[in-house]
Amino acid sequence: MEENLEIEFKILITKNIYEQIISDYKITSSYQQTNYYLMHPILSELKDTLRIRQKNNQYELTLKQPQIKGNLETNLIIDKKTKDKIIKHELITNEIFDLLKPYQLDSTMFITDHFLTTTRNEINTEYGLICIDYNQYNGLEDYELEYEITNYTLGKQYFLDFIKKYNLTYNTNCSSKITRLIKSLNNNK
């Protein structure tokens, strides 16, 4: 199990801007990842997120917990068998679910039928990683630009300079992927 502080700036962009950035930076390879969200009202109250990310037939269980700047991510590599058991509401014990015990939550208690698939393109920079994402969820699609950084001040300035080239502005982060997914579910009721 590993922990890291995720600090990122992110905005929604249009398909045209998405394609322009990929063209400008001559990005020729991308990869797909699918986030399976494990939802529960207690996590929503805490503003925590629990997900399983599938990428290249590898699986990672992640608990995200908000901090003053960014999110504390606690990650655990799991196998497909464990992922399938969690999705089927079977009891699993591991370090991530141990963190949820104080809230009387276990692996059997989550809504597990919502997922989001991202086609991700990346640009490495001196301050972090720019991700140009095409997201598909619940019959919808959107385009997102994320900048995952290690130094808040230097990273923010780099991000502002980067998006300025595309006549984009930044005030605050757009809604998270899970928030957009939940909103789409509520709109379909």
Language model features: what each stretch is:
Residues M1-K189:
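Phosphate-end processing signature that detects enzymes handling 5′-triphosphorylated RNA
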